[in-house]
Amino acid sequence: MRKTLLLLAATVACTFSVQAQKTYTLASPDGRLQTTVAAGDALTYAVTFDGRTILDASPLSLTLDNGTTWGADPRVAGVTRTSADKTIASPFYRADSIRDHYNALTLRMKGDWSVEFRAYDDGVAYRFVSRAKKPFNIVSEQADFRFPADLEATVPYVARGKEGDFDDQFYNSFENTYTTARLSELNPGRLMFLPLVVDAGDGVKVCITETDLENYPGLYLTNAGAAKNGLKGVFAPYPEKQEQGGHNRLQMLVRERKDHIAKVDTPRAFPWRMAIVGSDTDLA
């Protein structure tokens, strides 16, 4: 009888676990790229290209100053799917217009926030969206990019600052030559700035970058550890105290920092995190 009860309890627990995690798929217009978003204990996304894994399940989250973490045990309240195929004028680009063609998936969560994913023929992107009407601070963001193997990456390290001291490295000129190494060989004591490229093999490259950056710190990356075969995001905390300095006293130098990375006063969308997929010539 006891064995029967234990077996029944285990079966119920497994069933609950399976039911608790919801998955949503989003394909690019040409169908070659597919993103799988999972909402279970954590919020993750994975990407395949022509059926081959490009990104393993990678967690994403925002932690607020009230202790809430958007992405931890997320509860989906609604799902919206849209598509777009329009033209954007680009008078200062190498072409006078750009085709904006994508499929989108928006997960509306309980708790005044959403996460939006877009799938293009040449990449995927996601961003958080706040519906909160009261001001709050963002303490931290988790932006991980986990790959299926110890792949080769070509990255620009921050050139100045003390080894292992990210706060010192935040003050930099975003200038350096690129270094090529396996993910596990990337220096965990130095920040990397964007864009950077990971070689997924068979001529496929993955370019990590961001866009729509406003009133928010820029994304740096660092080695996430060999076991994870990936990169994790690092963000500069909000300035507390600044003073004039630097070359010819032209810069404002941050001397002290607050315990959060961003202030949010009104409903808004946050920066896009992007994984562009293509060949070397596609990325040029």
What is the predicted function of each stretch?
Residues 1-22:
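Bacterial Sec-dependent N-terminal signal peptides
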Residues 23-284:
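N-terminal accessory beta-strand-rich subdomains and adjacent acidic, glycine-rich linkers
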